[in-house]
């Protein structure tokens, strides 16, 4: 069975930068270990990077969330340091929106796809739902121990919403 691990937005700004949270910091080691295990198992590895530019505050998202973050090529835009060594041999998708619309084509040959990362209630749920919509016969899973939301409550609500849409929550 061909498997993939999708790592959503494990970027400095979401961990200890402008939108960082203690919960995001707390999952870094678990995500790094999950990535290491996936690489050792020969799984396909995909990273997404939330990618904005200097005009972010003038965008629709910037008007609703007026906090500059993940401005390419700032330090905050970069992947957390523990994951950088793994990115060189992975697929890395820059995305200007919550969902990486090109993501399904990169994992269409996989039967089991696990999603981890940040933020559970925004980009993780968006990409998990995108994958489920485009690849309805694939097993789409979200490892809740390797995700964090904007708040613990919104993290839990997002996991419940994904369960309702037949996404397996681990």
Regions found by a protein language model. Give the residues of each.
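Internal catalytic-core helix/loop-beta-alpha segment
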Residues: 73-122
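A short glycine-rich beta-strand->turn/loop micro-motif centered on a GG-aromatic cluster
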Residues: 114-118, 137-150
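A general structural motif
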Residues: 1-2, 42, 109-113, 137
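Conserved strand-to-helix beginnings and helix N-cap segments that scaffold or border functional pockets
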Residues: 104, 125-128, 152-156
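Short, glycine/serine-rich, charged loops/turns that create anion-binding
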Residues: 11-12, 52, 97, 120-122, ...
């Amino acid at each position: 069975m061909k498997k993939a691990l999708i790592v959503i937005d494990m970027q400095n700004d979401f961990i200890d930068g402008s939108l960082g949270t203690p919960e995001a910091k707390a999952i870094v080691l678990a995500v790094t270990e999950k990535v290491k295990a996936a690489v050792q198992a020969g799984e396909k590895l995909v990273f997404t990077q939330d990618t904005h530019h200097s005009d972010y505050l003038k965008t629709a998202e910037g008007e609703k969330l007026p906090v500059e973050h993940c401005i390419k090529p700032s330090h905050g835009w970069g992947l957390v340091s523990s994951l950088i060594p793994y990115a060189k041999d992975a697929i890395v998708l820059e995305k200007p929106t919550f969902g990486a619309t090109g993501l399904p084509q990169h994992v269409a040959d996989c039967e089991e796809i696990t999603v981890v990362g940040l933020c559970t209630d925004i980009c993780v749920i968006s990409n998990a739902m995108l994958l489920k919509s485009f690849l309805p016969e694939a097993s789409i899973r979200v490892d809740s121990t390797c995700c964090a939301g904007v708040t613990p409550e919104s993290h839990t609500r997002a996991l419940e919403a994904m369960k309702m849409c037949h996404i397996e929550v681990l």
